[in-house]
Amino acid sequence: MFNFKLDSFQEKAIDAISKDENVLVTAKTGSGKTLVGEYQIHHSLQKGKRVFYTTPIKSLSNQKFHDLKKIYGDRVGIMTGDIKFSPHADIVIMTTEILRNLLYKQGTPIGITPELSLQNLDAVVFDEVHYINDPSRGSVWEECLVLLPPEINLVLLSATLDTPEPFVHWLTDLKGKMCHLISTEYRVVPLIHMTENGEVIMDAKDTFHFEKYKAWIRKYYSQQDELRKHKERVKAREEGQVIEKEVRVGSFLDRMNKLILKMDKPALFFVFSRKMCEEYASKVSTDLLTSSETADVRHIVKYHLHKYPELQTMEGYHKLTGLLEKGVAFHHSGMLPILKEIVEILFDKGFIKILFATETFAVGINMPTKTVVFTSYRKYDDAAENLRVLRTSEYIQMAGRAGRRGKDDKGIVIYLPIHEPETPDVVKEMMTGKRATVESQMKFDYSYVLASLGSGKTIENDTYWMRQNNQEVEQYKDELATIKRELDTFTMKEKEHMYEFTQRAQLQEQIRYGTAESKKVVQQKISKWDNSHVGPYWDSMKKKHERHEQLVARSHKIETTLDSLKLFLKDIELRKLFLEKQGYIENNGLTQKGILASEVHEAHPILLTEVYTKKLLQTNESNEIVKVLSCFLEHDETDTKSPIAQLGKQMQECEILKTDWIVTDYWYDVVGDWLEGNNYVCEQYGIEHGNFVRAMLKLANIVREWVNIATLQQDTEMIEKMNGIEQKLVRGFVIPNSLYLRI
């Protein structure tokens, strides 16, 4: 099958797959682990069977569909939520959520019949399986692994992980057959990490050069100091005349353009800001393409995008195409998906010499480059609501884009800081620190309870969460027993004498809050206590008292933790009680109302079902219904006190659910204007086109689920009312299709 020599880890993985055994391959970006998944596809087809290939994001699914279609033609299908093409094909590419929803539906007659089937399925390839660690989505991967029948073979492809053995042991026990852990740190194309002036920070053997980095920092600050003095002299001479930022000698833009001229290309600049991606791209001062290449770019852009005349009215389109003709581009999640794809297509063909991108470009998309440039080692963390240093796994994944197998003898990773550079200790820890461990992110939420009761698949006892939870409980119990044994060694006399130290601490506390007169009295008591507790014996008692306090504090902390672990499991029972009270379940099975809720994946299942079954929108026109449904779309500035009257009462009645949902009125007026035919809502409301497209496609899915509920209820009035509404949502530049499906 392969006309080149395989690496050792690839040979081991292929051997396991040939024996129909499961494999987890952990390797760095660019190491060739994708080949393992491709062999599983070949092996399954040779047996006359089918294979699923799952990815964490739609864009990666689209690209994988394109890659495999070039090899297997019409035997490849795709299911992503927005795109459905040939779901019964021999090879089906899908997002992991699609597989999870199918697995709960499989074998149960309730609800809408799924479009996918496990019939004749031999294997599932999970690409980027380290997403199991993602706090918001990791549960999906874990549910899939538990729900898949043991006879279906698994190929798990992951970035490097720290101590993945416990996870592999769980998977082996779960499936009742061997799961091979195949890990490699080897890269065919080694990486050299350096500063903007070529000083090596970390070499190809992953040795961090601490002193060299320190020396570079000193030189950097010296140059910045000279730049500051120069600017002050110029300012005095010019008497306040404004100097254009982009031409200032020594400024970031000046350093960036000098680096672009001398560096090996193509190059990928990671910029952790959508706005600045576009800003820096527009400041590249050099045309990097020949006139012939520019003509080719124009032809490719016209060929792929001529079907979308609405793009011509968008400022961002003209901004991007102007840069593309110079060999420069930007790529971030705020862009229209098809514009991101045209950038990827041109990058893959070698027409993009300099690309400014956010972190999303590092996820899965197979776009290697010669050089990677970091403009910062910090990114915004939504959870922390602040900037933080990149985790080692994040840095490795992004840096791993450098070095093209078969083209480059090494990959170059450069640090070109916009602001002050990070300290040597911070950079060393980031580059050489531990990889991520596999930590269960399992969520036993309302969607899980509904899905498990509807399918009859109660899986909590089989989850990796339960394995980790049980191990954690046992470890804490063992530690508690050890603490108890040590506490039992203290004699009654020692405890009495140790208590005297507690009394002294109480006196010390009185000094903090007493009056001047009372403090004087207390200080005299403390002095008297100190004078009567001297000598080796009391020194020994003091140490024993400190140790006793440590043990008691640790014991209380462990007991609190154990209580919280037990309460977590009780959450499922509390949710079941609530669902029973609200009429969703009966006798540990779903009622008709529960079946309706189990059809909802894109919005909160309980709240949406309550709105429907209480007929709160029955008399509304279709546009108004969709505007209300838009409240289920997430937005950064979410507000659970939505003013939408139709939802307010239901939210109050379901107060117990409050922590489970996010509703916002952010999209309410936007959607109303869009449905009325306003094509300029993004400009009017200041919304990035990519964000708007994602929101409208998700809203279209919510509308489909609303119609599914109406179908199950045989509500012909609602079905007819909603007829044609999807065409009003998905129109113009809201394009569900992918360029990858047509090339």
Segments (PLM) and residue ranges:
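Conserved pre-motif I regulatory segment
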Residues: M1-T26
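Walker A/P-loop NTP-binding motif
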Residues: D15-N22, G32-K49, E142-L148
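Conserved nucleic-acid-binding Ia/Ib motif block in the N-terminal RecA-like helicase ATPase lobe
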Residues: K49-N101, H169, H180
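Conserved C-terminal RecA-like helicase domain
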Residues: R50-T54, N62, K69-I78, L253-D254, ...
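SF2 helicase catalytic motif II
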Residues: T96-R100, G107-V155
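Conserved interdomain linker/interface between the two RecA-like ATPase lobes of SF2 helicase motors
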Residues: V146, N153-V155, T160-T172, G176-K283, ...
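Non-catalytic terminal extensions of ATP-dependent helicases
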Residues: A329, G334, D348-I352, M442-I743
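Conserved segment of the helicase C-terminal RecA-like domain
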Residues: M367, T371-E429
